[in-house]
Amino acid sequence: MSRRGTAEEKTAKSDPIYRNRLVNMLVNRILKHGKKSLAYQIIYRALKKIQQKTETNPLSVLRQAIRGVTPDIAVKARRVGGSTHQVPIEIGSTQGKALAIRWLLGASRKRPGRNMAFKLSSELVDAAKGNGDAIRKKEETHRMAEANRAFAHFR
């Protein structure tokens, strides 16, 4: 056992305009080459586009999208006796949100379209409605976990 103290878990800071932690998590994941101001710009433009499209609060759409994409269970590769098994594991809320954000950004990057703000807003609206690539990814993960349920005892 380690003699060092355990690191305290950092709480996510909230962004300056919406005062929301999810927005800040999204900004930190979309960030490339340390250009945080550009990341904020993209997110705020996307949220503005969501406001125009749906005529509802963009934060509620964002929350709904992330809630819809957050997985409850995932599979983890584990080597047992020379063969690798996909072992289903439960996911905590923080890790689930992080995965959901990663999937949403990945799906929006793959989308055809003009700019990232437009693609992200479209993906978030789709995810909030219950369709889109990120939702498909979640369902695929759940299917994998269900198919490999027999290996759950390898945890």
UniProtKB/Swiss-Prot annotation:
CDD domains: uS7_Chloroplast
GO terms for cellular component: chloroplast; ribosome; small ribosomal subunit
Quaternary structure and partners: Part of the 30S ribosomal subunit.
Assigned protein family: Belongs to the universal ribosomal protein uS7 family.
Name of this chain's protein: Small ribosomal subunit protein uS7cz/uS7cy
Main localisation: plastid
Gene Ontology molecular function, alphabetical: mRNA binding; rRNA binding; structural constituent of ribosome
NCBIfam families, A to Z: rpsG_bact
Keywords on record: Chloroplast, Plastid, Ribonucleoprotein, Ribosomal protein, RNA-binding, rRNA-binding
Top-rank taxon, per record: Eukaryota
An individual GO BP term: translation
Disulfide bond annotation, renumbered to this chain: none
Pfam families: Ribosomal_S7
Organism in which the protein naturally occurs: Amborella trichopoda
Subcellular location: Plastid, Chloroplast
